């Protein structure tokens, strides 16, 4: 019975795709079937979604729309995507539909999008069937790289803004990503059902910041469905179809990839020209390697195999690639022996934050190595290098896009591979410009410094350089003084200050990346009671007075605790490290001096007092010289012990300093 229902409800819908010409002649009948499919039970809808789509190549380009949803974090982007998929009949209407496109456990737990996802929809409008390709995007600043890749496959975007929170820092960044890509931008105010919502005020913000007219702004609620039914028609009317030609040779852009343990690398392609058929051989414009298409199709929202992908379409391919290193994001693919001009690629992901990852037990090193290798197959933006610490043993030094990226990577290690690690305090890549030439380098050549051990002496360099970012902070104007003081304390340089409405301020500062990777965001939220938002983008390097700070225990340097600091912050940083060590190192039989030094000069010191044995306890009277003699002998013994004694620094002490 279930099989009969499936055939009755669904079969005509896929015949529409296979025989587009016959569909035009039978518009009324197909419309009735579509309407019935949307009103049917969840079982029928599930069956519909499971049916393979086999003839997408016949779909005309003018009936295709590729769009993305961009927004600040927690503005309802994933919930809106769920509602659109429900309206199009891709998934059944159910209260269980929450973050359908967020596949990772960490995404569902944190309520954020980390990995860009794609879903195709079939939607009937004015008697015509359209293929809508939705590409969901992350909202956090660390994953801007994912956003820029997704936008390369689109012709338009939905710019979603919370109707109560208004324009935030990431809203500004995402708008300009879409604007620079010359995409059609449809502004959408979400969460209008909330009591605190003020759509008119937020619409005026959009006009003031982005020059978007209030009447162009759509007002919806993804939670209760208000206004959602008008979004898909608006997308069809306002977003242009892709510009492409199916008669030209194949030209396809690879804009994302992930790893499957059974099938190898699965790549997401945007077909710019020509068409791609299962069994054909393609060639990479980057590596010149050739691959055979083993499988291809669209995401609906799960993988649905097809025979062909045509011009303007977005879909997945399986081509026997063994590593995501073969699937270079931004690469152009063409048919073998039919070369084409490569499409403009992407800037490679640049690590902004470095941290050491070490196993809790040295015996688990190989387990950690295997877990990191498997995880980086799905996240090619992470750079990995071997590392070794005198205190923590062998490990790895990893480069991340930001602090949230680092946290998410660590959480995925624990959840997906059951590996617990020690993460050292994050640092940033400095540079040193060498004073003299040598066999291995030119005069004034720049060297990237990612670890303190690489830090050159001041006599060898002309200047040190530190990475800086252009930060955008949006907050209520009553916190203006606190925000200015915070940015000044972080050695920031003010660029611009403007009001986005009567009460909210947008502040732009050039800030050292080293100053914001630890606790800047926490301080920002604390000083503004959570009302501020922060976004940053790379702004190159600038000259800085840097120094290598060493930690000495009774005059002996501890290499594992050496770090690079700005000279202005050397005394404060040294004091903090010395205090942490004083609390973590157990008392010895002799006094222990903890010193922080820069170029041999002590900038901070703490002393751990010796454990004192009462050697005069057995003296119950008599001459005082007897007590003095015992005390003198004890003092001499401690002096000898201090000269030959070796301080054992426990692992907990290193963790107190190195761990974030």
Curated annotation (Swiss-Prot):
Record-level GO BP terms:
positive regulation of translation; translation
- Which domain of life, per UniProt? Eukaryota
InterPro entries recorded for this chain? EF-4, EFG_III/V, EFG_V-like, G_TR_CS, LepA_C_sf, LepA_CTD, LepA_IV, P-loop_NTPase
The keyword Membrane is annotated on this UniProt entry = yes
Any idea where the tr-type G domain is?
A: 62-243
Amino acids binding GTP: 71-78, 136-140, 190-193
What are the protein's GO molecular function terms? GTP binding; GTPase activity; mitochondrial ribosome binding
- Write down the membrane topology: Peripheral membrane protein
The record's PROSITE patterns line, in alphabetical order, gives: G_TR_1 (PS00301), G_TR_2 (PS51722)
Main location per the UniProt record: mitochondrion
Please provide the record's keywords in A-Z order: GTP-binding, Hydrolase, Membrane, Mitochondrion, Mitochondrion inner membrane, Nucleotide-binding, Protein biosynthesis
The record's SUPFAM superfamilies line, in alphabetical order, gives: EF-G C-terminal domain-like, P-loop containing nucleoside triphosphate hydrolases, Translation proteins
Give the reaction(s) catalysed: GTP + H2O = GDP + phosphate + H(+)
Q: Which family does it belong to?
A: Belongs to the TRAFAC class translation factor GTPase superfamily. Classic translation factor GTPase family. LepA subfamily.
What HAMAP family does its record include? LepA
Task: State the remark under miscellaneous.
Answer: This protein may be expected to contain an N-terminal transit peptide but none has been predicted.
- Sorted alphabetically, which PANTHER family does this protein's record hold? TRANSLATION FACTOR GUF1, MITOCHONDRIAL, TRANSLATION FACTOR GUF1-RELATED
Name the UniProt record assigns to this protein: Translation factor GUF1 homolog, mitochondrial
Native species of this protein?
A: Trichoplax adhaerens (Trichoplax reptans)
């Amino acid at each position: 019975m279930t099989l009969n229902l499936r055939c009755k409800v669904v079969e005509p819908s896929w015949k529409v795709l296979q025989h587009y010409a016959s569909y035009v002649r039978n518009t009324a009948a197909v419309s009735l079937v579509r309407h019935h499919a949307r009103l049917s039970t969840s079982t029928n809808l599930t069956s519909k979604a499971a049916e393979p789509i086999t003839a997408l190549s016949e779909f005309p380009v003018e009936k295709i729309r590729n769009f993305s949803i961009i927004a600040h974090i927690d503005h309802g982007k994933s919930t809106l995507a769920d509602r659109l998929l429900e309206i199009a009949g891709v998934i059944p209407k159910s209260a269980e539909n929450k973050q359908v496109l967020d596949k990772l456990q960490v995404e569902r737990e944190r309520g954020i999008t980390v990995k860009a996802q794609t879903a195709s929809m079939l939607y009937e409008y004015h008697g015509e069937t359209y293929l809508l390709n939705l590409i969901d995007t992350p909202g956090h600043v660390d994953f801007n790289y994912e956003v820029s890749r997704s936008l390369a496959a689109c012709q338009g975007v939905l710019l979603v803004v919370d109707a109560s929170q208004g324009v935030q820092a990431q809203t500004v960044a995402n708008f300009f990503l879409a604007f620079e890509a010359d995409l059609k931008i449809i502004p959408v105010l979400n969460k209008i059902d909330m009591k605190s919502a003020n759509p008119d005020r937020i619409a005026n913000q959009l006009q003031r910041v982005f020059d978007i007219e209030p009447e162009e702004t759509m007002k919806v609620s993804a939670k209760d469905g208000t206004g959602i039914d008008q979004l898909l028609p608006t997308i069809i009317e306002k977003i242009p179809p892709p510009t492409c030609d199916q008669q030209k040779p194949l030209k396809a852009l690879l804009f994302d990839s992930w790893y499957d343990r059974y099938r190898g690398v699965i790549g997401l392609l945007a077909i710019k020209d020509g068409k791609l058929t299962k069994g054909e051989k393609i060639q990479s414009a980057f590596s010149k390697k050739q691959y055979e298409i083993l499988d291809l199709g669209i995401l609906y929202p799960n993988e649905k195999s097809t025979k062909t992908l045509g011009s303007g379409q977005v879909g997945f391919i399986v081509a026997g690639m063994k590593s995501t290193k073969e699937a270079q994001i931004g690469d152009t693919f063409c048919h073998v022996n039919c070369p084409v001009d490569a499409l403009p690629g992407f800037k490679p992901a640049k690590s902004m934050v470095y941290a050491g990852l070490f196993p809790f037990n040295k015996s688990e090193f190989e387990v950690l190595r295997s877990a990191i290798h498997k995880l980086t197959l799905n996240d090619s933006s992470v750079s990995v290098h071997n590392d070794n610490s005198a205190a923590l043993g062998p490990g790895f030094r990893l480069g991340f896009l930001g602090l949230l990226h680092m946290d998410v990577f660590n959480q995925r290690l624990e959840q997906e591979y059951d590996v617990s690690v020690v993460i050292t305090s994050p640092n940033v890549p400095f540079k040193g410009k060498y004073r003299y030439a040598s066999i291995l380098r030119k005069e004034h050549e720049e060297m990237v410094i990612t670890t303190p051990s690489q830090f050159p002496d001041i006599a060898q360099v002309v200047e040190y350089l530190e990475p800086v970012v252009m930060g955008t902070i949006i907050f209520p104007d009553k916190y203006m003084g606190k925000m200015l003081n915070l940015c000044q304390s972080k050695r920031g340089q003010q660029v611009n200050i403007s009001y986005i409405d009567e009460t909210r301020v947008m502040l732009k500062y050039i800030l050292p990346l080293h100053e914001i990777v630890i606790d800047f965001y926490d301080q920002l939220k604390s000083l503004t009671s959570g009302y501020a938002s922060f976004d940053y983008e790379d702004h190159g390097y600038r000259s800085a007075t840097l120094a290598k700070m060493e930690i000495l225990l009774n005059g002996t340097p501890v290499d594992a605790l050496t770090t690079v600091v700005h000279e202005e912050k050397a005394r404060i940083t040294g004091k903090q490290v010395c205090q942490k060590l004083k609390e973590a190192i157990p008392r010895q039989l002799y006094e222990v001096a903890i010193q922080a030094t820069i170029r041999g000069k002590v900038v901070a010191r703490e002393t751990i007092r010796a454990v004192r044995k009462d050697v005069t306890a057995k003296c119950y009277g008599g001459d005082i010289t007897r007590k003095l003699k015992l005390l003198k002998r004890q003092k001499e013994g401690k002096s000898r012990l201090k000269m030959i004694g070796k301080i054992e620094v426990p692992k907990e002490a290193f963790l107190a300093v190195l761990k974030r």
